[in-house]
């Protein structure tokens, strides 16, 4: 069912990135990591780039003009890593047709944007799955363990990975770390525990858009998988604020016959962060 694409993994995996560099500033001692597709790489962010820490981005989700639910992304930082958590929950009529409750967690090295490990709790229709993935860059392998909470069965698998990968949530903020100059493009590797997907982004232009969070000048970025199991199966457009923050304001995905629209509703900041 196409509604399963509302899951955290299905939602974000169609996004991610392929081949001419966007020319962002790069750390002097951090070489770019090359993926399986020629030109696919993760470029370490400029020291001046900062993740939007201690904030929760809240998005409404629309499916064929129906209010489908809510998605959130929260970023926290400690001394060694950044922790990103994304949630996806259906609501209303869509929830009655196909219920989704997903939680996706990622640990990322903010100096390189290499994802260290991810975990995902998925409740999608009758399915209930727990997945944990550790990325071992020294051995160039990912180690995946998946538990079916309905049947009690466990599946384990290892996969080859390039020297650095991002994941289906952190990839948005990796993109935000780039300069996003009009007409530029890049490819980079994305992995959520299976085979690595190389996704190409192209900066199509800039226009003014209005979302519930406000009205902004925005940079429109097209993203499409160019290798792996999702090649040719979906396209995503993301509108980032046209400023140094590059806040993802709006997302529109086309997956088969389904179209999903995500719009930023609000940014929540804990009282202690004010």
Pin down the residues of each PLM region.
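N-terminal compositionally biased, intrinsically disordered segments and leader/signal-like regions
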Residues: 8-9, 38
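Hydrophobic, well-structured mid-protein blocks that either form specific transmembrane helices
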Residues: 129-175
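Bacterial N-terminal signal peptides
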Residues: 9-21
